[in-house]
Amino acid sequence: MRVFVAGASGAIGEPLIAELLKRGHSVVGMTTNEARARNLERQGAEACILNVFDAEAVEAALSKASAEGVIDELTSLPKELRDMPKYAAADRKLRIEGGGNLLRAAIACGARRYLQQSSGFFLKSAKATLADESSPLDVNASPGVSASAQTYTELEARLFGCNAIEGVSLRYGFFYGPKTWYYPGEAAANMVTKQQNPVVGNGEGVSSFVHVEDAAVGTVAALSAEPGVYNLVDDDPSPQAVWLPAFARFLGAPEPLHISEAEAREMAGEDAVYCATQLSGASNAKAKRLLGWNPRRLVWLKA
């Protein structure tokens, strides 16, 4: 299949391009500068330097690419986790406005299928249950989580409200692996090493992770599977009180500190408390069944 990948230089970009090429697809990777374009070409993809906010340029690029499938991995995320609030507005604009241009161009140029990045970590399910693909995003969570969930909700509504193209929403877990926050030497790992990421309260908030290489495999499988929503998360949704100490041991870091919800709220805000105590984990049963997908176990739980 001829595939156009937007956001080809993000965390999932390199493994996604590699997996597409491995499976025999012809790939055009969209990026924003010459250096990143050269990296894509070294991987074996065609490169397209594009401002996704320029609707005419986006349509011209899609027309030239003659893509059957379009994969939207557009994000604007910071290197440091503490900078997330500063990036939130730009990230939303990129996904809503830039992604809107991409979707309209894909339809105008006759693409058959559109794959959209979504969230498998801000879902809402009943306590002690895992969210499935029918579960909503938690738009009534803490302020930052709620805003992010609202963005993903709008993206999914836009995609599935359109009958002119086959839509697939990929609800990824928290990415880990090379070039992610959870890779040794990167933001989340550094915070754990410095004991700056404590277990909060009971630590019952359940996080779902996925290795970027497994996310890439699932994404490519979704190009030819039944349209719809897929949770691309691993087999180990885990409470903060379990995964965080395990991650510290994996890194060779000191045991995480333990603080109360009130202390966390004062130090880091409502989002930190919500993520540590109220997140819902997600089930990957549908993806395993329909995509033939078999993600690795969460690495640091095995360490």
Predicted regions and their residues:
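Conserved beta-loop-beta element that borders a ligand/cofactor-binding pocket
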Residues: 118-119, 154-178
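Glycine-rich "substrate-gating" loop/helix at the edge of Rossmann-like oxidoreductase active sites
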Residues: 143-148, 173-181, 202-210
